[in-house]
Amino acid sequence: TALAGLVEKGAAYVLEEGKVTRYTPVAPEEFCTNKIDRLQEIKQKVLSQLPVLKSDAEGYITIKGELEIINKLKNTVRQAEARIYVSANKRVMELLKSELVDALNRGLKVVIISDKQFTLPQAICYGTEKQNEQIRLIADSQTVVTGDLEDEENSTCLYSCKRNLVDLFKDALKNEIKLIELQKGDNRG
C-alpha cells in the first residue's frame, strides 16, 4: 500500500502489527534530519572514492544560470582562507550574507562594495549606488568570479584562477573603492 511505501521511505512508522496495521507520520523535523544525515553519508562515500583534484582549472570557466552562479559565489566564499573582496548589489549580498558572516567568524578579511543600505558588522563596507546585477568577487587574491545576474536563468559569469585576470579585477576594485572615497569627500564639502 501507499502507507507501507511511506514506512520504507522513512516518512511514517508502523503503530501496530496484527490484523489491522496502523501508521503514524514521522515528525517533519526528524524526517528532514534523517534525509540530510543520509545525504551527508552518501556525500562522504562519493568524496572518498573520487580522485583528488590538485587545483582549480587554470583556464576560464563559464557558469550559466542564476542558481549555479550564486552557488559558485557561496562556495568560493566558503573555500577562502584569508580574504574576500566582493562588489554586488544588496539583493546579491543578502544571498551571500550567511557565508560572509561565516567567513568573518573564521577570521577572514571581508571587503564589501554594495548599496549604502547593506552593512555587515566586522566587514569593511563601502556604500555606493549599485543598481545593476553585476557581480565581482575575489578570494585570497587567487580566484575571481565575475558576471551578472540580469537574465536570471540565462545569466553567465566567468570563474578563473588566472593571475592576470585576478590582478585586473583587484585593480578595478581598488579603483572603485578610491572613487567611492573621493565621492564621499565631495559630498562633505
Task: Place the predicted regions along the sequence by residue.
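Basic amphipathic alpha-helical segments that dock to polyanions
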Residues: 1-10
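Short, cationic-aromatic polyanion-contact patches
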Residues: 11-37
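Amphipathic alpha-helical dimerization/coiled-coil segments
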Residues: 30-76
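Short, flexible loop segments at the rims of nucleotide/cofactor-binding pockets, characterized by
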Residues: 59-65, 86-90, 123-124
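A short, aliphatic-rich alpha-helical micro-motif
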Residues: 77-78, 138
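Short, surface-exposed connector motifs at secondary-structure boundaries
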Residues: 78-84
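Short catalytic-loop micro-motif centered on adjacent basic/acidic residues
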Residues: 84-88, 111-112
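C-terminal regulatory/effector modules of DNA-binding transcriptional regulators
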Residues: 92-94, 99-189
